[in-house]
Amino acid sequence: MRAQRHRCLTGRSALLLAGLLCAATADSAWFRTAEQQAADQFEDGEYSEAAEGFSDTYRRGVALYRAGRYTEAGNAFENVEREEVKADALYNLGNTRYKLSDFEGAVDAYEDSL
C-alpha cells in the first residue's frame, strides 16, 4: 500500500512539474523585461514597436531609423548620454540629417563623431 501511494505521489509530482514547465515556456514573455521584448521585436523586424519598448535612447534611435522615422531617430540620437556609443550616435545623427536633406547638419554631425 505504501509503495503504491509513493508511486501515485511521484506520478502527480511529475505531472505537476511538466505542467509548470509547459506554462512557463508558453508564457515566457510574462517574465521578460520591456527591453528584452523590444530586442525580440527588433530582431523580428518590428522596428516601430521595438522603439516604443526601448528605454535606452541609442537603441530607440536605431529602431526608429530602421522604421524610417528619421526626425524621431534624430531626436533620440541627439539625447544619447552613454559615452560608449556617443560617437556612433553622432554618426547616426548625421545619417538621419542626410535622410532629411539637412546636408549641412549631416556634415556637422559627422565631424562631431570623429
Question: Each predicted region: which residue ranges?
Answer:
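N-terminal secretory signal peptides that target proteins for export/translocation
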Residues: 1-9
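Sec-dependent N-terminal signal peptides
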Residues: 9-18
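N-terminal signal peptide c-region/cleavage motif recognized by signal peptidases
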Residues: 21-26
